[in-house]
């Protein structure tokens, strides 16, 4: 039995397909979802969603939520991009820049630290989805 997965951002649907398995980056760790999974509502963190059909596909996301019910997974996130649509070299440069920016943040500026960490997670997800950091 197939699992219907939809990844939706405020401005578009990134994925709407039947898959065999999906792995979500939840706030409590990665969650693997197969057909017949119990109903679930979970918060998602910036990371990579992995979906398996005949092979694996990566989707970089930022924070959001996922609902699993009746063999359907609805993922609502702020942004999402398929790994195949992300330029690997551009993603690598953005990730390196975010790492450097975090290293330069004033340790006393908590907001700046949080913002830099959030940007690092976002750029890391895009880099990983594009095939970097294997």
From Swiss-Prot:
Highest taxon of the lineage: Bacteria
SUPFAM superfamilies recorded: Epsilon subunit of F1F0-ATP synthase N-terminal domain (SSF51344)
Database matches in InterPro entries: ATP_synth_F1_dsu/esu (IPR001469), ATP_synth_F1_dsu/esu_N (IPR020546), ATPsynth_dsu/esu_N (IPR036771)
Entry keyword Methyltransferase: no
Keywords of the record: ATP synthesis, CF(1), Hydrogen ion transport, Ion transport, Membrane, Thylakoid, Transport
GO cellular component term, pick one: plasma membrane-derived thylakoid membrane
Localization terms from the record: Cellular thylakoid membrane
Topological type in the membrane: Peripheral membrane protein
NCBIfam families referenced in this protein's UniProt entry, alphabetically: ATP_synt_epsi (TIGR01216)
Subunit relationships: F-type ATPases have 2 components, CF(1) - the catalytic core - and CF(0) - the membrane proton channel. CF(1) has five subunits: alpha(3), beta(3), gamma(1), delta(1), epsilon(1). CF(0) has three main subunits: a, b and c.
PANTHER family for the chain: ATP SYNTHASE DELTA/EPSILON CHAIN, ATP SYNTHASE EPSILON CHAIN, CHLOROPLASTIC
HAMAP family in UniProt: ATP_synth_epsil_bac
Function: Produces ATP from ADP in the presence of a proton gradient across the membrane.
Protein name from the UniProt record: ATP synthase epsilon chain
Organism lineage string: Bacteria, Bacillati, Cyanobacteriota, Cyanophyceae, Oscillatoriophycideae
